[in-house]
C-alpha cells in the first residue's frame, strides 16, 4: 500500500494542475509557426533548395485556414530547425526575400546552418559550422543568434574525431569536421516583444535540468527541431512529449516548431494550446502563454525527487518496522495466552477430586 501512495499523490496533483485556469497570454504577441512537412529525402537535395525556401515563404503568408493574409497581425514568425537548407547568411538574396516577407514590426525566428571563424580574428583562419537559431528583423537584418551547444554525437560531430577519421569514418557527419558548439552556459535571447527566450535546438529539449544554464530565468522556451529523421516511428511523439515535460519542470511556456511535426504551443503546465500533428502541413497562429511561478523542480532540481524518494523510503521502513513490532507483540501475547491457558488447565487438574472404585 505504501508503494501506491506516491503514484496516487502524483496523479491527484497532476489532475489538480491540469484543471486550473488557462495561463494569461503575453500582451501584444501573436506568433505563427510554419510546418512545411518537407520530406527528409528532399531536405538536403541541392536541386530542391530554392523550391523548399520559396515554399516556406509562401506557406508563411497564409493563415491556418489557407487564406492569404501576408502575416497581418503576426508579431513573430517561427520556422523549424534548418528550415532553410542552405547557408542563408551567405546568400544576400535570401535575406532580401525575408525582408520582403516580413511586415513592419514582425520578426522571424528560424533554424539555419551558418559559418563563422572561431577565435580572436574574424577574418583569418578556417570557418566552423554551427547549427543555429537566427532572429531576423523586418528588413531581413540579423538581430540575434543562438548556436546549439549540445550536439548529437555521430550526427553533428564525431567523437574521437582524429582517431576515427584516420580509419575513414568522417562521413558519419553531414558537415565535414562536424559542427562546433556554441557559447556556454546557454545565453538567453532578447527578442523584441517576447520575454527572455531560451533557445533549444532539436534534442536539447530532452535533458531535465539542463534547459536553463544561467542565473537568469527565461520566460519562454523555443524549441526548433527536425524530426524527419525518425519517419513515422515513435520518435517524434516521444521527442514532443519530452519537451512538454521540460515546460512542466520549469513552469515555462514552450513554442515548438518541427519540420514534419509535432509543432505546438504548450503552457507551463504542459497543456497543449495549439498543435499540428506529425506529417501535417500547415501553420499555427497563437498567443503565447505567460510563465508560471517556478515549480519545485525549477528551484530544487533533482533534489525534489531525491527528497521524495528518501521520504517514502523512510515511511516504508517505518511501516515495515511497525509491522515487525506488531507481529512480535502478537506472538508474545499469543504465547502468554497459551501459557495462561496451560497454567489454568494444570490448576484445574490439580483441584479435581480423586474418586476410587
How would you describe each model-predicted region?
Residues 1-357:
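Enzyme catalytic cores with a strong preference for nitrogen-chemistry domains
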Amino acid at each position: 500500500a505504501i508503494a501506491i501512495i506516491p503514484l496516487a499523490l502524483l496523479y491527484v496533483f497532476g489532475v489538480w494542475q491540469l484543471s486550473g485556469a488557462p495561463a494569461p497570454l503575453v500582451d501584444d504577441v501573436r506568433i505563427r509557426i510554419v510546418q512545411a512537412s518537407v520530406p527528409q529525402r528532399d531536405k538536403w537535395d541541392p536541386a530542391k533548395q530554392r523550391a523548399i525556401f520559396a515554399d516556406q515563404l509562401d506557406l508563411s503568408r497564409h493563415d491556418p485556414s489557407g487564406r492569404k493574409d501576408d502575416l497581418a497581425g503576426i508579431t513573430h514568425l517561427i520556422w523549424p530547425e534548418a528550415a532553410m537548407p542552405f547557408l542563408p547568411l551567405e546568400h544576400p538574396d535570401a535575406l532580401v526575400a525575408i525582408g520582403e516577407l516580413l511586415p513592419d514590426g514582425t520578426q522571424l525566428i528560424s533554424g539555419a546552418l551558418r559559418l563563422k571563424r572561431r577565435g580572436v580574428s574574424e577574418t583569418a583562419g578556417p570557418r566552423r559550422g554551427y547549427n543555429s537559431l537566427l532572429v531576423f528583423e523586418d528588413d531581413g537584418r540579423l538581430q540575434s543568434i543562438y548556436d546549439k551547444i549540445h550536439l548529437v554525437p555521430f550526427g553533428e560531430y564525431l567523437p574521437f574525431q582524429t582517431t576515427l577519421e584516420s580509419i575513414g569514418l568522417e562521413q558519419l557527419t553531414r558537415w565535414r569536421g562536424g559542427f562546433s558548439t556554441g557559447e556556454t552556459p546557454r545565453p538567453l535571447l532578447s527578442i523584441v516583444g517576447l520575454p527572455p527566450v531560451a533557445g533549444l535546438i532539436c534534442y536539447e529539449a530532452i535533458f531535465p535540468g539542463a534547459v536553463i544554464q544561467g542565473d537568469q530565468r527565461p520566460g519562454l522556451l523555443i524549441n526548433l527541431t527536425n524530426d524527419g529523421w525518425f519517419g513515422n516511428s515513435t520518435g517524434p511523439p516521444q521527442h514532443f512529449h519530452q519537451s512538454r515535460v521540460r515546460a512542466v519542470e520549469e513552469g515555462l511556456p514552450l513554442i515548438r516548431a518541427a519540420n514534419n511535426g509535432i509543432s505546438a504551443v504548450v503552457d507551463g503546465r504542459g497543456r497543449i494550446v495549439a498543435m499540428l500533428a506529425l506529417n501535417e502541413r500547415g501553420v499555427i497562429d497563437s498567443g503565447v502563454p505567460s510563465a508560471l511561478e517556478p515549480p519545485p523542480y525549477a528551484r530544487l532540481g533533482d533534489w525534489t525527487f531525491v527528497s521524495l524518494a528518501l521520504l517514502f523510503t523512510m515511511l516504508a521502513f517505518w511501516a515495515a518496522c511497525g509491522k515487525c513490532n506488531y507481529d512480535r507483540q502478537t506472538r508474545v501475547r499469543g504465547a502468554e495466552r497459551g501459557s495462561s491457558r496451560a497454567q489454568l488447565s494444570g490448576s484445574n487438574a490439580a483441584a479435581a477430586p480423586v474418586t476410587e472404585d
